[in-house]
């Protein structure tokens, strides 16, 4: 579990103190979420999905650069590759983009999800599912996208 948290901290960055106004921090904490990042332009928390899986949800706040959500998706994927994590594949549904990565040393798969549609303008919802399980079917990957986006949107006011 310590390795899991360490990897997530390395992937998501440092902690500060000022959550975006549209994120329901109290509800996240009441539901057992653990804060990773707390800034005015980004908020992130992790939640245990089952005994082998964690979901880290991050809200990025601000104007999107040229290229929109697709650019954010590629940027997040490329940041993780710089950390020595292997790229496996990518996909997309109507709901979001997904990138499948593998951390050889830790033996974990990371599924990075970026929601396509912004429920609130200038709030981009991302999720990283960390698990020992490998999911490859289109239905499994679609379910991961749905899980991450649904969990993220659940805590927006």
What are these regions (language model features)?
Residues 80-118:
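Signature of long, low-cysteine stretches enriched in small and polar/charged residues
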Residues 4-13:
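Sec-dependent N-terminal signal peptides
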Residues 20, 32-36, 84-87, 153:
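Short glycine-aromatic motifs
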Residues 20, 40-44, 56, 104-113:
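Short, surface-exposed coil-to-beta transition loops
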């Amino acid at each position: 579990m310590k390795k899991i948290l360490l990897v997530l901290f390395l992937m998501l960055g440092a902690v500060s103190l000022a959550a975006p106004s549209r994120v329901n921090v109290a509800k996240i904490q009441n539901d057992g979420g653990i804060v990773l990042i707390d800034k005015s332009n980004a908020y992130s928390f992790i939640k245990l999905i089952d005994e082998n899986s964690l979901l880290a949800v991050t809200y990025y706040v601000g104007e999107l650069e040229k290229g929109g959500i697709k650019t954010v998706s590629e940027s997040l994927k490329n940041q993780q590759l710089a950390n020595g994590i292997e790229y496996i594949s990518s996909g997309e549904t109507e709901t979001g983009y997904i990138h499948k990565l593998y951390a050889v040393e830790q033996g974990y798969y990371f599924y990075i999800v970026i929601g396509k549609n912004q429920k609130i303008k200038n709030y981009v919802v991302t999720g990283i599912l960390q698990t020992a399980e490998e999911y490859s079917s289109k239905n499994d990957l679609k379910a991961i996208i749905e899980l991450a986006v649904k969990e993220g949107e659940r805590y927006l006011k």
